[in-house]
Amino acid sequence: MDRPLTYMDGETLMNTVLPPIRFVISQLLPQGLHVLAGAPKVGKSWLALWLCLQTAKGEPVWTFPTAGGAVLYLCLEDSYARIQRRLLDVTDEAPENLFFATMSEKLRSGLEQQIERFLSTHQDTVLVVIDTLQRIRAGSNDANPYASDYRDLGILKELADKHQIAILLIHHLRKMNDDDPMNMISGTTGISGATDTNFVLRKDKRSANTATLYCTGRDIEYRELSLEFDGIDRIWKLREDSVEPVSYTHLRAHETGRN
């Protein structure tokens, strides 16, 4: 295809009024493609469910405001019965703009079209969560795993950018420890390279109910959030933020009731 290169000179770019990046969760989750990775049974799905719930309600995620809007959560390793139990654990009232699906097609086999149809019906959608990434990937005979990872995530990245939404992929970590948590994301660097933001949820100790959420991305400031899992409310509560101090008032709000 003989298509000319589209370009812009620096002066024009500097003087062009461009729309700001849209944040679904202020300072944490902008529009684009993102990965939330953690070890099995670490509590990724509990965190993802709560993020979906808060976003759909337009209520804060810890100290971070949300844009509010419709949310689609593809819970591809769960049943509706399990999702119902979890919802009853974390909230007294689920919003009508939070949608769940337990089955979908795979990438390049109809998933993109399924999401497109959902977005056309629910035009106020701001967030799509896919739990897990591996469930939507078909087997590949590609001799270059990096290229395969980058190509697959590129499809979702293009979809997110086209509709100015956030797509959050729930993923796993390697079993081997690393000083840099981002290096523990399973797969090649094609995964972390294709995404706009990467989150790693890592327990402080295997038996502990505390963990650190490492956050890094193109459009956010690097931060580490110290979290504690509340076994009664079934949500991850914020203890410390490496960037901004957490107020006593905020901590008390978490201790005395549900968000």
Predicted regions and their residues:
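Walker A/P-loop NTP-binding motif
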Residues: 53-60
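Short alpha-helical segments that sit at the start of domains
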Residues: 239-251
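Motif I (Walker A/P-loop) of helicase-class P-loop NTPases
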Residues: 48-52
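Phosphate-binding/switch region of NTP-binding enzymes
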Residues: 35-37, 41, 45-46, 74, ...
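Pre-Walker A (Motif I) flank of P-loop NTPase domains
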Residues: 31-34, 69
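Single conserved hydrophobic/aromatic residue that forms the stacking wall/gate
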Residues: 250-259
